[in-house]
Amino acid sequence: MVLIAALAALAACGGGDEETTSTTTSAESADTESTTTADASGCSEVEEVEVLAFAQHKDQEFVAADYETNPPAGGDHNPEPLQGGNFYAEPPRLGEAVHLLEHGAVIGWTNDLAPEEQEAIEEAFNEVFQEGYYQLAAVENPELEVPFALSAWGALQTCESAAPEAIAPFVEEWYASPKSSESALACDGTARRLPPC
């Protein structure tokens, strides 16, 4: 079941609530920062992930272990991006989803949500879509270690339950992420209405 919705990444469009920052180091020695941008129950602070502004195109099947975070927030990916503006009930190629992130998108990742939880996530994405954020996607990901997560190029937020209230603040902060060299594609005029990127 594929539904139109559209999710993408908005950091260039800016603005944020109170922020607290701390630096940590992952097992793979990548620096990350945690930034509070959403007050969603059951969700982590937004983690800023150190990524290159661009990555390599590789024609291979990617799995969660190929990336520093799960779900991915950047890295090498397939040559073709995932089609934004959709809900994917079946997992698409992970490398195509990561390529969409490079284009400034925000992706909501789900793992076996109850039908009413999935519907709430889709409704929240549709509300953001109606505000002009068209590079969005919701993707089923059985490799996800939590029920719900949001990612953009260089940013990740994980949730211990479905958290539709976390979507709008994350999109407002990370749509068209300034951490990607290709994020302007989220604001390139192909949509009918665009956020102020």
Where are these regions (language model features)?
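Extracellular mucin-like PTS domains
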Residues: E19-A38
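Bacterial signal peptide processing site
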Residues: C13-D17
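C-terminal motif of bacterial Sec signal peptides marking the signal peptidase cleavage site
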Residues: A8-A12
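Helix-rich interaction surfaces within compact, conserved domain-sized segments
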Residues: E127-C197
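Mid-length scaffold segments of soluble, non-membrane domains
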Residues: Y88-G132
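Pocket-edge structural micro-motifs
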Residues: T69-P71, T110, E140, A152
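Surface-exposed, low-hydrophobicity interaction/linker segments
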Residues: T37-V98, Q118
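N-terminal export and membrane-targeting signals
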Residues: M1-L3
